[in-house]
Amino acid sequence: FSEKTANGWKIITKLRNKCGSYTVTDTYQGTERGVLVTSVLHRVSGGREVPRFGKCFRLDAAFDAVHYLGRCGESYCDMKDQFPIRAVDCAVADMVEPNLRPQESGNRTDCTVAAVSDGKTRVVFEAVGHPFELGIKPYTDRELLAMKHREDETRTGTYVTVQAFQQGIGTGACGPGVMPEYRYKLDSDYTLQFLVRIEDEPAR
């Protein structure tokens, strides 16, 4: 359900899967620097670990130019030191890995700002308090699950995911899985906070 508050709109979503039951409370507050998004994940019952927590935004495929400040390659909390933090400009296709079988890929850690542009308008995501993790794909996660081969990849938009965290990937294919320090226990609530705003691209 949703309700209007003194500081903006609050939306509460109840989620349930085979592991447990959760609530996500989202608050959207207008500020001079954009809309302040605050999302709180709370475990009601069941599962005590969560693989990731974030918000996904869909934009038209025309938003293909990416800019971000963060780790300059695919990185996760247990695999990131090889990529320094720097400003990156690329296309959406460069944000996913060209695996023979399409799979989850392209996460960027330690991001403080990200933007996607169609050449006229830019949508900016800015970290508040802590850096976020960033994923940008040309299709949804649900669409990705159905893909078996590279030729199955079909662009349906630009999907920007801003995350508080994503668990590590470990080396489960040829060694140990994710180490305990790179898993996220639901012993307490998790909060994700960032700003989002829309800007006109400067005339050229």
For each predicted feature, which ranges?
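Beta-strand/loop-rich accessory regions of lumenal/periplasmic or secreted enzymes
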Residues: 1-204
